[in-house]
Design a protein with these regions (language model features):
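Conserved two-lobed SF2 helicase motor
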Residues: 158-174, 329-343, 349-369
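Conserved interdomain hinge at the start of the Helicase C-terminal
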Residues: 254-280, 287-290, 344-353
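Conserved C-terminal RecA-like helicase domain
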Residues: 121-123, 131, 138-147, 283-357, ...
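Conserved segment of the helicase C-terminal RecA-like domain
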Residues: 374-377, 381-383, 389-430
């Protein structure tokens, strides 16, 4: 059938704007959403009347069909077929192409389920996608009918429709089994079933929820007959495959030997924008964007429109300044290392049709809503964390499938660039033309040694090859076993059934059984689990075996096995610290950091810096080159308290065996920032990680959340309270979305609350802002003590203190004093002052930082005015009237 409303059915839930167009009206519709209002209510009517009875499957289908018709949506054949199968109680595996309306079918399933009184789940692999779907469903079904659970976020958890990560549902299935209140589940991005680390969470619900209806959807499923047969066997319901729908927008393919710049220019001339240029590293994406920015990508009208659309965005960070220039040229950048506000801006500009070109990574395949006409692959190989290899068919189709905008394009375009040596050879051949003599003289370039290459045949095979059959992944962990034991009864038998009925090979099942035996033995030996034989009833046959019951002897921590599984260890480990120690606060921070996920790009930068310092020191000490190379392998980033934490964790695991599923990772990121008195911008500059500032921000947001949520009040000294305030201030100022999301968790009114108006306070977080200023000024003291004049010039050139002026000031200082001290006294409050007298009227603080000298004269320092509005907007201190020198001279100025 034809799709009569432009792109509506294909983007009902996943589109940024389409879902909101389905809400509105007055009265009930405005409150619950236009579709949610058609379902019998799950809540007690306020007027005391009898609620409408639950609908039959046919009635629910009819209401959904009428709802789509009222909005001018004519269902495609495969959509109607899938919805009718769901109404009949069948499972559906929906493997139709990108843009073929899977989201609308999922919406229909969720509505029909809730209208029949069933609790429904929508699962996705990443929190960002769960959050996006949650807000879209709220618009259509109404805020009272939709909840969200993502480990660190709990909103309206009693709602009839729950959006959650796959692991949330899997853990519920293990904990509650057949008795779980799960009527139907729409599993998005089901190809994650084959993910080596996370695939278990997609398989477990299929094996443990026999009364649940499933819809499994992905554009790159491959052969799923084994999964369908397993689902039918476990549930007794039919499983229908809907996998042969045509692409709404067909794809054309081209393998090119032109340079990337030439390819883009030709595509633009042919009217094939917008283009998404796929790279397999963040650095490569930025390099291409910077190269293309000089090619006149955008028209004057587009540049003006981009400038207008982006004017509300602050580009205060180092990468932000780069991005602002690129966007002004019509070129976007999109990858996971960016701040959320920058990624969202690029997506919004793309959705408005303002960006002709986006340079990004292969994250294009999951969870971003960017309309694209042409996908350009810069390579057909990628580094998978272990080695360079060619793309798999599923990876290729995930990326290529995003080309073509339904309702806008008659076709989508997928272009693959040849390897560099092949492009060079093509240039030589073109230059030689048809001259046989010149052609014979050509010395063709070869691929570099060890280079994993590709060619046109590689591209054609990827186009023709169906996605690989999903390889099932099941694992057995302490956490999973604990969850199964929570049900009571014979938990070991249930784990055996889980393994035996899985889709793993016989060899894999045997290994999993051995692993399960080991875990049960560990849990029983440690006293966490007890195994009891219950004698048969008196009237049972004489040969009846006793029933087996497994039970927990401990209370599990709240949110067990969710997003912060090591929080209980952290609470126990804090007892090892001496509150009277000078290093107490920093050591506590190191313990928190050891429980957080590694920000790998940041740690790699730390390791590079540590090795550079070590190499310079060894060279200065006269160590031979070969020995330097050998020794440098042992140098890595700082790991505070590593020995103490390792010993404590080993002991903890003996008492809490499920902790063996996880591992500590000592590191010093937040601690290093604090000890070097760095703000966000300064730390990025120090490590040279401008392209990974989003990674650093997410890490700091997690550290803030852990410090604020997990560390007991009685363990917080004054300094730690200051640090928590400062950290929250920094994260909010740089990009508030990461903190706001979890702080609003559990508060449904936050979804439609207006922003606060008329706040009298000039400074929203006085403690945090004060520490930000103190750290910024003491960082300058530290740099001055180390004679890092160039760094000082880079920090302060905007306020008139260039490198040359700093050098003159320090030369004058050293004529009077030997050194600049940076000990505890030098950092104390006595050496720093704030005059807040002009805060209300001028929105400035007058600040003064004294340099501590060996004679105790305290006659040299920094004075300046802090622009409070700009500082709070950007998360870094913005100065006015900034000066450095002897106090007498500064006061005269």
């Amino acid at each position: 059938m034809a799709q009569t409303t432009t792109d509506t059915a294909t983007s009902t839930v996943s589109g940024a704007g389409a879902a909101s167009s389905f809400s509105g009206g007055t009265g009930t519709e405005a409150e619950f959403g236009s579709l949610g209002a058609l379902s019998p209510t799950w809540w007690e009517p306020e007027d005391g009347s009898e609620p409408e009875p639950w609908l039959t499957p046919d009635q629910a289908f009819e209401r959904f069909f009428e709802w789509t018709s009222d909005r001018g949506i004519e269902l495609w054949d495969h959509q109607e077929e899938a919805l009718m199968d769901l109404a009949a109680g069948d499972h559906i595996i929906l493997g139709t192409p990108t843009g073929s309306g899977k989201s609308l079918v999922a919406l229909g399933m969720l509505f029909m389920g809730m209208a029949q009184g069933k609790r429904c789940y929508y699962t996705a692999p990443i929190k960002a996608l769960v959050s996006e779907k949650f807000f879209d469903l709220v618009q259509v079904l109404g805020r009272d009918n939709v909840g969200m659970i993502t480990g660190d976020t709990h909103i309206n958890t009693k709602a009839p429709v729950i959006c959650c990560t796959a692991e949330i549902l899997a853990n519920d299935a293990l904990r509650e089994g057949e008795g779980a209140d799960v009527g139907c589940v729409a599993m998005d991005e089901f190809h994650y079933f084959a993910d080596p680390d996370r695939g278990w969470a997609w398989q477990v619900p299929l094996l443990t929820l026999p009364h649940t209806q499933f819809m499994l959807m992905s554009a790159t499923l491959g052969d799923v007959t084994a999964i369908a047969a397993s689902l039918e066997e476990h549930t007794g319901a039919a499983c229908d495959l809907v996998v042969d729908a045509p692409r709404p927008v067909p794809l054309s393919y081209d393998y090119v030997t032109t340079s990337l710049e030439g390819t883009v220019e030709l595509a633009m001339r042919r009217g094939e924008a917008p283009l998404y240029i796929v790279h397999f590293s963040q650095d490569a994406a930025l390099a291409t964007a910077q190269s293309l920015a000089n090619f006149g990508i955008a028209s004057k009208e587009q540049r003006e429109a981009i400038k207008e659309a982006a004017k509300a965005t602050s580009f205060s960070t180092a990468f932000g300044k780069i991005l602002k220039r690129l966007l002004g040229c019509g070129v976007g950048v999109h990858h996971a290392g960016m701040l959320p506000r920058y990624r969202l801006l690029v997506e919004r500009l793309a959705q408005q049709g303002l960006l002709p070109v986006i340079c990004g990574t292969d994250t294009l395949g999951v969870g971003i809503n960017v309309p694209i006409h042409t996908v350009v692959l810069t390579a057909l190989t990628k580094f998978d964390g272990y080695k360079m290899r060619r793309l798999r068919a599923r990876e290729f189709h995930q990326i290529a499938g995003r080309a073509g905008r339904s309702g806008f394009d008659t076709e989508g375009m997928v272009i693959a660039e040849a390897p560099e040596h092949e492009i060079e050879n093509a240039k030589l051949m073109a230059k030689a033309g048809d001259d046989p003599k010149k052609l014979r003289k050509i010395k063709k370039k070869k691929a570099p040694e060890g280079f994993v290459t590709w060619n046109k045949q590689t591209f054609e095979r990827l186009i023709e090859t169906q996605p690989e059959t999903l390889k099932p992944r099941l694992r057995i962990t302490h956490s999973m076993v604990i969850s199964v034991v929570e049900q009571g009864g014979d938990a070991r038998a249930r784990v055996h059934d889980l393994i035996e009925t899985s889709l793993q090979t016989p060899e894999e099942k045997a290994k999993l059984e051995v692993r399960a035996d080991e875990i049960f033995a560990t849990l029983i030996d440690s006293g966490v689990v007890v195994r009891t034989e219950v004698p048969p009833a008196p009237d049972a046959p004489t040969d009846a075996a006793p029933d087996i019951d497994y039970a927990l002897t401990v209370d599990l921590p709240e949110d067990f096995a969710l997003d912060q599984p090591l929080s209980p260890f952290l609470l126990a480990a804090l007892e090892l610290l001496d509150p009277e120690s000078e290093t107490y606060t920093m050591d506590l921070i190191s313990m928190v950091e050891a429980t957080l996920e590694d920000p790998k790009q940041v740690l790699r930068a730390q390791e590079r810096a540590a090795r550079d310092r070590a190499m310079a020191e060894m060279k200065a000490d006269g160590v031979e080159y070969e020995e330097r190379l050998e020794r440098i392998q042992d140098v890595t980033y700082e790991k505070p308290l590593e020995d103490l934490l390792d010993a404590a964790f080993d002991k903890y695991c003996q008492e809490v065996p499920w902790a063996n599923d996880y591992q500590l990772s000592p590191k010093s990121v937040l601690r290093d920032m604090l000890e070097s008195a760095s703000d966000f911008k300064g730390y990025i500059q120090k490590l040279g990680i401008a392209r990974s500032e989003g990674i650093l921000l997410r890490y700091l947001a997690e550290a803030y959340r852990s410090l604020d949520r997990t560390v007991p009040i009685e363990k917080r000294d004054e300094r730690l309270r200051d640090i928590i305030s400062w950290l929250g201030f920094v994260v909010r100022s740089v990009d508030s979305s990461l903190v706001d999301e979890w702080e609003n968790a559990g508060n449904p009114t936050a979804l439609d609350a207006a922003p606060p108006q008329g706040i009298d306070e000039v400074v929203a977080d006085r403690r945090g802002c004060t520490l930000l200023v103190r750290n910024a000024l003491f960082r300058r003291v530290t740099l001055a003590a180390r004679e890092h004049v160039r760094d000082l010039g880079e920090l302060d050139d905007d306020w008139g203190m260039s490198e040359i002026r700093w050098q003159k000031a320090l030369d004058a200082y050293h004529e009077q004093h030997e050194e600049i001290l940076t000990d505890g006294d030098a950092r104390s409050a006595a050496m720093f002052s704030i005059d807040e007298s002009d805060e209300k009227t001028a929105h400035i603080w007058h600040v003064h930082q004294i340099f501590a000298d060996e004679d105790g004269d305290h006659d040299f320092g920094i004075m300046g005015d802090v622009d409070l509005d700009a500082t709070q907007d950007g998360g870094e201190v913005i100065f006015k009237n900034y000066r450095v020198g002897f106090i007498e001279d500064l006061l005269e100025d």
